[in-house]
């Protein structure tokens, strides 16, 4: 019998089905544990932390899912696009492609998203092909980002690995804006190469000014225990930058982070 589905935006009644879908695809190994809490999924939608789209079978079962959500970047208007998955029985259909196209057509415009980003895993080509086909640009390679156990249930033996999984960092802008970008001269060639795919008339200037003496560094550490990843986000650099960075790197080591970003 041919499998069919309906694409729709998230409803509260989908929350239990989304949790069940995560368990079918990832078991209990997904590193962000809030995905296993139906009440948290509903709360995130209500307050705009996460917007989701789903594919439902004719019987109303959630058979596919994708999300736009706030993650580690400090900009509350920059949403990560990810968590695309379908039930095993639907993997030989185009449900995932249809769901991603539907979500991109509906959610960013509905909620005024100006830019989104994602992490396309490197243990298969599927997500890389989808992001490329949908106008994303690759801006970085995150080496050994995800633990192997996150994928032992999600993929077959060919895509599963005993090693950590790297990802491509990708961005898509819906409202490109020219910016003045300051960069260390030593990285000029590399950064111009990276920005070439997302250039919106940016102006590039060498970062030659000294650290501001009367200002403290504003930076924070986010640790994702399940993935053994620590991310240091710097919003403003002050005279104490070197000491503050060393402190946060030490805290990341104490948290047993395998990957530090």
Tell where the protein language model's regions lie, with residue ranges.
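Conserved N-terminal entry element of GNAT/NAT acetyltransferase domains
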Residues: 1-13, 185-234
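Conserved acetyl-CoA-binding loop-helix of GNAT-fold acetyltransferases
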Residues: 86, 92-107, 116-118
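Glycine-rich phosphate-binding loop
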Residues: 90, 131
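Catalytic cores of nucleotide-enabled group-transfer and carboxylate-activating enzymes in metabolic
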Residues: 2, 37-43, 52, 96, ...
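Conserved acetyl-CoA-binding loop of GNAT-fold acetyltransferases
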Residues: 132-141
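Conserved beta-strand-loop-alpha-helix junction that forms the acyl-donor binding cleft
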Residues: 117-127, 137, 145-146, 259-261
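C-terminal "cap" of GNAT-fold acetyltransferases
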Residues: 146-185
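A conserved beta-strand-loop-helix scaffold within acyl/acetyltransferase catalytic domains
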Residues: 9-15, 19-89, 120-121, 237-261
